[in-house]
A protein has these predicted regions:
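Nucleotide-activated donor-binding/catalytic signature segment of Leloir-type glycosyltransferases, i.e.
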Residues: 263-283
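A charged, aromatic-enriched C-terminal amphipathic alpha-helix characteristic of glycosyltransferases
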Residues: 343, 361-395
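Short alpha-helical donor nucleotide-sugar binding micro-motif in glycosyltransferases
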Residues: 282-283, 291-295
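Donor nucleotide-sugar binding/catalytic pocket of nucleotide-sugar-dependent glycosyltransferases
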Residues: 142-143, 150, 155-205
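Acidic donor-binding loop of glycosyltransferase active sites
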Residues: 293-307, 320
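A short, histidine- and acid-enriched strand-loop-helix "catalytic/donor-clamping" loop
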Residues: 104, 108-110, 121-143, 156-159
Length: 395
């Protein structure tokens, strides 16, 4: 008899697609993915990027799914908006009669309400969430309260799937033993990006010419939301520390993304490296590869909230160097100081500048590859193992 697995997710997310496809492909599994809303399928406003867009590749292809609502993404965070959507999601999952429910994240309100409804109904629950103790700094009182709340929350779940080393340490600190954990490091759709590598890497020099970037220039690439938690303004501050360094004359900054700090970032870059930066705005999935292909080093100076940083996976698949702050979760798993990686102290422009100077001596990138990178199938395998170990009629 097939095992039935339900997954609960806020909205369609590109990075989850290969996970659900892998689970659905197993002949011993019947899968249903329940989304709170359809954000990203149709053009809609994204509050973080500050632009209106729809994904240019289908994030729900290749597996069964349903939607609890067609409400805007923001409705999932408000109590009044999330409650009716949660009831609908819980009803859809209950009707599916799963053996277990894999819950992605522990927020927003929609996820919390639905999880509580499912727990009340006696469902077996598993958790895959962006958990860490390093992404945010909290006062003693806030930290104490958070720990108490999370300990009780994690008690609802039979098993958890940490996204990385720091995530696993977080669970251990809060009393979840290793036997209730299955580590599967956060992964991107490596097959999708392998196709991007094959498409764009041979065009590297042409792509650079289109942006008037010389072959000998060293391109620093920023990809993502241009928001305070990402601390993008630390980049021009770091470059200012290199004013007397002749290597600054070979640096070009390419910024891919949008957000509330875009204008400020572009203004400060122009002041420090006039004419040697390119603002590309928001780019959809199919176009990201062109910018990784022309770049040399990814920079990710986040100051808080960066539980992993999937752009690190993407950049390394293209063979780029990576410089990130110590607040980035993947720094421990993927970037620890090496020939092609540096980790700087969060918020420290001088330390960031030293990392840039150390890695900008060459415009050569490594051979693209995925051998050392996390793969979505690792999580698929861990989930399947747990499914097969479940006793009969445990849902």
């Amino acid at each position: 008899m097939k095992r039935r697995l339900a997954a609960l997710v806020t909205h369609p997310i590109q990075y989850f697609k290969p996970i659900f496809q892998g689970l659905a492909a197993d002949p011993e599994v019947e899968l249903l993915v329940v989304y709170g809303c359809d954000h990203g399928l149709e053009a809609s406003a994204d509050p973080d990027f500050g632009v209106t867009f729809a994904w240019d590749s289908n994030p729900i292809e290749g597996f069964p799914s349903s939607f609890a609502s067609r409400a805007p993404l923001q409705a999932l965070s408000s109590t009044t908006g999330a409650w009716p959507i949660a009831r609908q999601a819980a009803a859809q999952i209950q009707a599916f009669e799963p053996d277990s429910v894999l819950v992605f994240s522990y927020s927003p309100r929609f996820i919390q309400f639905t999880t509580l409804l499912l727990a009340q109904a006696g469902q077996t629950l598993w958790l895959r969430a962006e958990t860490t103790d390093h992404a945010l700094e909290r006062s003693g009182v806030k930290g104490f309260v958070r720990d108490r709340v999370l300990k009780r929350w994690y008690g609802l779940f039979r098993h958890v799937f940490p996204i990385g080393t720091r995530s696993q340490q977080h669970y251990l600190r809060l009393g979840i033993p290793l036997e209730k954990q299955s580590l599967a490091r956060y992964a991107v759709d490596v097959d999708f990006f392998a196709a991007q590598v094959a498409q764009w890497t041979p065009q590297r020099q042409q792509l650079r010419r289109e942006l008037q970037i010389q072959p000998e220039d060293h391109v620093l690439l920023y990809v993502g939301k241009i928001s305070p938690v990402k601390n993008p303004l630390l980049l021009p501050q770091a470059l200012a520390h290199l004013k007397a360094d002749p290597r600054l004359n070979s640096i070009v900054v390419v910024v891919v993304g949008d957000g509330e700090l875009r204008e400020a970032l572009e203004t400060e870059l122009e002041a420090v490296i006039p004419g040697r930066w390119r603002g590309m705005g928001f780019q959809n999935q199919q176009q990201l590869g062109r910018f990784y292909a022309l770049a040399d080093t990814l920079v990710l100076p986040s100051i808080q909230g960066e539980t992993w940083g999937l752009v690190v996976n993407e950049a390394q698949q293209f063979g780029l160097n990576v410089i990130c702050s110590d607040k980035v979760g993947s720094s421990v798993d993927l970037v620890e100081p090496s020939e092609r990686g540096r980790v700087h102290r969060s918020g420290d422009a001088a330390d960031f500048a030293r990392s840039i100077a150390e890695l900008c001596t060459s415009s050569a990138v490594a051979s693209p590859g995925t051998e050392h990178l996390p793969h979505p199938q690792q999580l698929v395998g861990q989930v399947l193992n747990q499914l097969k170990d479940l006793p009969e009629n445990c849902g």
